[in-house]
Design a protein with these regions (language model features):
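ATP/NTP phosphate-donor binding region
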Residues: 1-85
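Short glycine/serine/threonine-rich phosphate/pyrophosphate-binding segments
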Residues: 18-21, 40-44, 68-71, 93-98, ...
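Glycine/threonine-rich beta-strand-loop-alpha-helix active-site module
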Residues: 69-176
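Glycine-rich phosphate/pyrophosphate-binding beta-alpha loops
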Residues: 139, 246-279, 356-360
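Carboxylate- and glycine-rich phosphate/diphosphate-binding segment that chelates Mg2+/Mn2+
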Residues: 147-255
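Gly/Pro-rich interdomain helix-loop hinge
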Residues: 270-345, 381
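Short, amphipathic C-terminal "tail helix"
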Residues: 343-382
């Protein structure tokens, strides 16, 4: 057995822990860039804590998924405002943007020199500005991942900037920040976290540490996600879901993902659709295809996922597709066709998905025909 494992240098978890933010970064300097989502007012409490610690903050808002222009503009703000460190405060998009801005500040050349797929893919050699990730949703786990996803709408693709040096110095997870999130966002982001846990659990790169995280994370997400959606003001389920999302990020950063995210990358680039909803619409069909094609010795892992989801030690992998489809129905997840995907898109999506980095860790190597069949099944069910 041989594996490597890494995560953020420091993880702080707990309701109310946001108040520590000023003292955590004060030694790095007295000027910080806050990268947040569309509504900068959501960062008002964060800014108050920084003010109390004597840290001056500058806010840079990201409207949706970051693009090359987003990172370039944010980098210019860092230079113009002489910021010493960076906070990513929001969902996956804000945290990824903050991550990319922090790392690119110290690199030579342009961001395209370091991007996968459409760039030169040069390795990142220098540590970036100190970076703290603060999630306000329970979904992507970007607070503990080593990559930032950037969208290129003009090409209809998403690509990653990736390096171990991009792991945050601190991941500060305050579940109380997710209280009151709208139903749709809670459901979509939560299903993304659940998908990440399931894919990492059966990944070809899984190891004993990611196995342990996935086992507990799946149990937490299965028990708490619906309660978060239908009882949005209760802190207990929010804490469990935040922990599940954290585990999902650590697991995917060390074990990889699979075909669901392999498909989701090109679909997200080609269509304006919530990432978590795309993953949820694909998950039952990828699960079924993987289950049909795995080797007998792989079956135990799939059964253990079923046991975590159903909360039943006798559950088997064959029950998972129905369970996931039922959950998606209750959480009002739109089917793939309703998200804009049609049969005419299948060949191109499958072609792009086959090249996606997430596909490499799928437990089964599906050929082009199998990938197209999975997509067609998802569309027909829609």
């Amino acid at each position: 057995m041989h594996f490597e494992f890494s995560t953020a240098s420091r993880i702080i978890f707990g309701s109310g822990c946001l108040e520590q933010i000023g003292t955590l970064g004060r030694d790095w300097g007295r000027r910080v860039l806050i990268v947040t989502g569309r509504d900068p007012e959501r960062a008002s409490a964060l800014r108050e804590h920084l003010d109390e610690a004597g840290v001056t903050s500058v806010v840079y808002s990201v409207a949706g998924e970051p693009t090359l222009q987003t990172i370039e503009e944010g980098s210019e703000v860092v230079r113009a405002e002489a910021c010493d460190w960076v906070i990513g405060f929001g969902g996956g998009s804000a945290m990824d943007a903050g991550k990319a801005i922090a790392i690119m500040h110290t690199q030579e050349g342009e961001i395209l020199d370091y991007l996968e797929v459409i760039g030169k893919g040069r390795p990142i050699r220098r540590e970036g500005l100190p970076y703290i990730a603060v999630p306000t949703t329970s979904g992507t786990g970007a607070e503990v991942t080593r990559n930032a996803v950037l969208g290129f709408p003009e090409h209809g693709i998403k690509v990653s900037l990736r390096s171990p040096l991009m792991l945050p110095r601190v991941a500060l997870v305050d579940p109380s920040l997710t209280l009151g999130l709208p139903f749709e966002i809670t459901a979509s982001t939560g299903l993304d976290a659940l998908t990440q846990l399931i894919e990492a659990a059966v990944s070809s790169r899984a190891n004993p540490m990611t196995d342990a995280l996935c086992e507990k994370g799946i149990q937490l997400a299965a028990a708490s996600l619906e309660r978060c959606c239908f009882q949005p003001g209760e802190i207990g389920p929010r804490e469990d879901m935040a922990l599940a999302a954290l585990y999902s990020g650590i697991a995917l950063a060390n074990a990889g993902l699979g075909a669901v995210h392999g498909f989701a990358a090109p679909i997200g680039g080609m269509f304006s659709a919530p990432h978590g909803a795309v993953c949820a619409a694909l998950l039952p069909h990828v699960w079924r295809a993987n289950l049909k094609a795995i080797q007998p010795q792989q079956k135990g892992k799939f059964d253990r996922v079923a046991q975590g989801l159903l909360g039943d030690a006798s559950a088997r992998a064959e029950q998972v597709q129905d369970w996931i489809e039922g959950l998606c129905l209750r959480l009002r997840i739109r089917p793939l066709a309703a998200l804009g995907v049609s049969a005419s898109d299948v060949t191109e999506i499958a072609r792009r998905a086959a090249q996606a980095s997430s596909m490499k860790a799928n437990p089964v190597n599906h050929g082009p025909a199998a990938l197209e069949a999975i997509l067609m099944e998802a569309i027909r069910v829609s």
